[in-house]
Amino acid sequence: MAQLTVQVVTPDGIRYDHHASLITVRTPDGEMGILPGHINLIAPLNVHQMKINRSHQEGVDWVAVNGGIIEVNEDQVTIVADSAERARDIDLNRAERAKERAERALEKAQTTQNIDEMRRAEVALRRAINRISVGKK
């Protein structure tokens, strides 16, 4: 049976490297499923969870991906992101604290009507919520 080779790469190194039968990611155009034999492509990714179905009996892996790009070339899938964490590596307490900090920063930015700070806080909040969601899987 054909399989994908999936790598998730960040500036800190390879965060995930395994074979898969299906991966699901979120792009600005919506959710995308990649199966073996998928057409070659490069696409931007949203801050979202990535679902990796390993072979039939091996289960599912979840990775919190904070944006980046996906490249599919033959049956090699490479995700390049600023940061990414596997569900098993996420410290939920730390993620909850990051969410609280982002909420406070967003509230302050809204009060002062600082658009740049508001955008930064919104991104930080999305990332924290994504990490919490994946960490609970």
Curated annotation (Swiss-Prot):
It is a peripheral membrane protein. Keywords: ATP synthesis, Cell membrane, CF(1), Hydrogen ion transport, Ion transport, Membrane, Transport. Gene3D superfamilies: ATP synthase delta/epsilon subunit, C-terminal domain, F0F1 ATP synthase delta/epsilon subunit, N-terminal. One of its GO terms (molecular function) is proton-transporting ATP synthase activity, rotational mechanism. GO terms for cellular component: plasma membrane; proton-transporting ATP synthase complex. It is found in: Cell membrane. InterPro entries: ATP_F1_dsu/esu_C_sf, ATP_synth_F1_dsu/esu, ATP_synth_F1_dsu/esu_N, ATP_synth_F1_esu_C, ATPsynth_dsu/esu_N. Its main location: membrane. Produces ATP from ADP in the presence of a proton gradient across the membrane. Belongs to the ATPase epsilon chain family. F-type ATPases have 2 components, CF(1) - the catalytic core - and CF(0) - the membrane proton channel. CF(1) has five subunits: alpha(3), beta(3), gamma(1), delta(1), epsilon(1). CF(0) has three main subunits: a, b and c. NCBIfam families: ATP_synt_epsi, PRK00571.1-3. This is ATP synthase epsilon chain. It comes from Streptococcus agalactiae serotype V (strain ATCC BAA-611 / 2603 V/R). The lineage of its organism: Bacteria, Bacillati, Bacillota, Bacilli, Lactobacillales.
